[in-house]
Amino acid sequence: MVLRLPDPSHGGGAPPHDHTEDEWFKERYGGGGGGGDAPRSSRAVNPVPPYGRRSALAPRRKEDFGDGGAFPEVHVAQYPLDMGRRGGDGDGEQRGSSGGVLSLTVDGSGGRVEFDAVVRQGENAGKTVYSSPGDVLPKINAAAADADDDEQAAVEETTARTSAALRAIVEKRLSAVQPSNTLASNHDPEFIKYTPARQTSAFNSGAAERIIRMGETQQDPLEPPKFKHKRVPAPAGSPPVPVLRSPPRPPSQKDHDDWKVPPSISSWKNPKGYSIPLDKRAALDGRGLHDVQVSDAFAALAEALYAAEQKAREAVETRAKVHTEMKMREKEKAEQHLLQLATKARAEMLGAAPPAPSERSKAAAERDAIREERRRERRLEARAAAAAASKKSAATRDRDRDVSERIALGMANTGGGGGEVTYDQRLFNQEKGMGSGFAGDDQYNVYSGRLFAAQPALSTLYKPSKHGEEDPDAYGDADEHLGKIAKTRRFVPDKAFTGAPASVAAGKRERPVEFDGPEMEEDPFHLDQFLTQMKKGKHQ
């Protein structure tokens, strides 16, 4: 790049520019403002070489920059006015390493910030500072304090040993992951005093000697190895000791059976779908090796539950019988009371005293009472049966009926359609439908049958509404409405198509137009014809 730059305006033999005569140099180093008689600075001044001749320039001090910035064509670390230098500010004044800023520290026990580090710095660094609340508490028992110190020492020793063991494990794991060609350098850098051969001001920045720091270059840990190490094969050792063995014998059937290892059978997975007998699975589970012990408490519990159930049933039956008898007695008392009232009323109406009962009349009365009681029981049973039959609702009566008795399958539903939707269970077990492939592979029709398959259902679709009967003034009579429908020629169903022959003209229709689908061919893809042609070609 230096070779491509233009030549300087002055000739190559011109002397270098002396910055000591510049105004900025006189003002900075005491050379200006006092006239020509003012004493100049006794500090050595290194004139900056002209542009294009700075290959040997290495500015290190502030004077080398000439109160200016860094030289971009000089490829060394430059700090004009100590800007960017560690430990220095922009004015060239050195500061301390700390800079008056206290670093944040935490304690080792709980990770809490040590705020008392503010009072422990400076002149208090070597003193004992009581800054925690525990420092103001008095120590009552010195022996307990000593015991606590011993315990604390034991805890610290155990912690140190544990930490060392964990650190060793972690270092071992990390060393196994790190690359093997990383070399640890323990050599300290060497400082060499260098005196250049040329002592002029144009070389070595005017320095008579220089101290060079020499150290090892840091190696890239990811750099591949430069040399390939080959492992030397191990030398042949001593021959093995001969072992005397008996000659091999053919294994018997028992040996084969003993060496048969059953396959592993899982109780949870069977990915290959093997059929494993239950006895083999139970034997593999090992449950047959354990003796099953059934506790006697199970039998006692079952017996107690059975006895309690029988007692509860007997109690319920007894309670029901007593309740029924009480109702019967109440009914008998009511009937007897009514009979007495009726007898008394008839006697009062006749005006005659009732005859005195005799022995024969008493026996007849007992027989009549028995007959009346039996007749009353039969009447009560008949009433109960009639009440039970009358309580059976319509939904209960239709529950046992088949759906086909109430609806017509395969016909249009022209009714109101209100109420509960009823389905025939026989329709769910057919081979047709969306759940079973919808239709056969050789069928191309969308519907399995015609929409209107019966004439009686279609006749109801063209009936006039019943509004005429309810309000003849608004809608007219039903016959009149039907006549209007019959005379209406809006769609002209009996008119033939234009261009069609006259014989094709259709008459009046009583139902919608039905379109017949194309006849299904037995071989829609003409595979039989193709195979026949192929066979003929082979024979030819």
Swiss-Prot record:
Location(s), subcellular: Nucleus
Main location: nucleus
Nucleus is among the record's keywords: yes
One GO CC term, this protein: spliceosomal complex
Lineage top rank: taxon: Eukaryota
Region listing for Disordered, in residue ranges: 1-106, 215-273, 351-402, 502-526
GO biological process: mRNA splicing, via spliceosome
Sequence ranges of Pro residues compositional bias: 236-251
Positions with biased composition (Basic and acidic residues): 16-29, 83-94, 359-382
Key words, A-Z: Nucleus
Composition skew (Low complexity), residue ranges: 383-393
One Pfam family cited in the UniProt record for this chain: SKIP_SNW
Region ranges (SNW): 189-353
InterPro entries cross-referenced by the UniProt entry: SKI-int_prot_SKIP, SKI-int_prot_SKIP_SNW-dom
Family per record: Belongs to the SNW family.
Protein's name according to its UniProt entry: SNW/SKI-interacting protein B
The gene coding this protein: SKIPB
